[in-house]
Amino acid sequence: MQTVTLSIFRFNEFEKRLWVLGQMTANKLGMHYLPKAKFWKMFGSGTGQGFTPKPNWHVWSILAVWPDEETARREVAESPIYQRWTKMADESYTVLLQPTSAWGKWDGKEPFEPVKPASDVRPIAALTRATVKFWKAERFWAREPAISHMIGRNKDVVFKIGVGEVPFVQQVTFSIWPDARSMEEFARGAGGPHGEAIKAVRAENWFKEELYARFQILGTIGKWEGKDPVGEALTARPSEAPKPAPAPAAAQPAPAAEAPKPAPAPVAEKPALAVEMPKPAEPPKPVVEAPKPASAPVASKPMPQGGKPNFKGKPGKGGRKENA
């Protein structure tokens, strides 16, 4: 999955700053090459909050697009360009990013391949790149002081830097925020200097080319100003795992409570069968009635007629007495 790295380097000594200026010149002449990178750029930076036309000769950066995170980490650690810059710099810091959205072009290309995240991204990184029309540059930079003042006071912003390929006209801003809401409030807040600048850009068509991208943060390498500001934000971000935890806890008791309910039903059916089982024992009633037919032969009335003994022994005697 595509991975983007933004590496920033600080060169405190004058000789080191001269060295990095030579590196930038060599890059412009095509003497540098990153074979594994799909797209890459070298930048200078601005003073103050970073979003100014006045250069900061101490801070320089490299942005590169790699096929995957493994390649990105390996190249940042082993590529000759990165090794030279890291060795010469007093401080270096790399943020590894995964594009989640992108719109626009950079030098006529679409360098980022966004992948929609599975969940809300926190923290979130935003990058804007624009080529300002030369005759609009003065009006563009006139908006800068108010924007720098606003972002400098914003407690939500985790990290920010302004860099550029060509002074005054090719600018890149990079910032990291706790979430999309805080970023949107700064960028498009009603009446805010940044929101007003966006309106002016659209109304007066300041840009020759522009690109906007958002990223999920994969990790960091190194330190900046003696700490890892982005790594700290990743550690301190609102944990999304505990929120789902209460749901399963509430859901599990429900099935557990319903499970015993089927159990009483079978228990109730068994006694019913046990009660009905004795009913077939009613056949003893015919046993009681059996003697009744036996009493019928005892009360036999045909005996006075002579019965079978008189009929065989003395047939006429008994008959005559009956008639007399």
Curated annotation (Swiss-Prot):
Its cofactor is heme. Residues 226-324 are annotated as: Disordered. Its EC number is 1.14.15.9. GO terms for molecular function: metal ion binding; spheroidene monooxygenase activity. GO terms for biological process: carotenoid biosynthetic process. Keywords: Carotenoid biosynthesis, Heme, Iron, Metal-binding, Monooxygenase, Oxidoreductase. Binds 1 heme per subunit. It catalyses: spheroidene + 4 reduced [2Fe-2S]-[ferredoxin] + 2 O2 + 4 H(+) = spheroiden-2-one + 4 oxidized [2Fe-2S]-[ferredoxin] + 3 H2O; spheroidene + 2 reduced [2Fe-2S]-[ferredoxin] + O2 + 2 H(+) = 2-hydroxyspheroidene + 2 oxidized [2Fe-2S]-[ferredoxin] + H2O; 2-hydroxyspheroidene + 2 reduced [2Fe-2S]-[ferredoxin] + O2 + 2 H(+) = 2,2-dihydroxyspheroidene + 2 oxidized [2Fe-2S]-[ferredoxin] + H2O; 2,2-dihydroxyspheroidene = spheroiden-2-one + H2O. Coiled coil: none annotated. Could be biotechnologically utilized to produce more diverse oxo chemical structures. Belongs to the CrtA family. Involved in the biosynthesis of the carotenoid spheroidene. In vitro, can use nonnative substrates and produce oxocarotenoids with a hydroxy and/or a keto group, derived from neurosporene, lycopene, 3,4-didehydrolycopene or 3,4,3',4'-tetradehydrolycopene. This is Spheroidene monooxygenase. It comes from Cereibacter sphaeroides (strain ATCC 17023 / DSM 158 / JCM 6121 / CCUG 31486 / LMG 2827 / NBRC 12203 / NCIMB 8253 / ATH 2.4.1.). The gene is crtA.
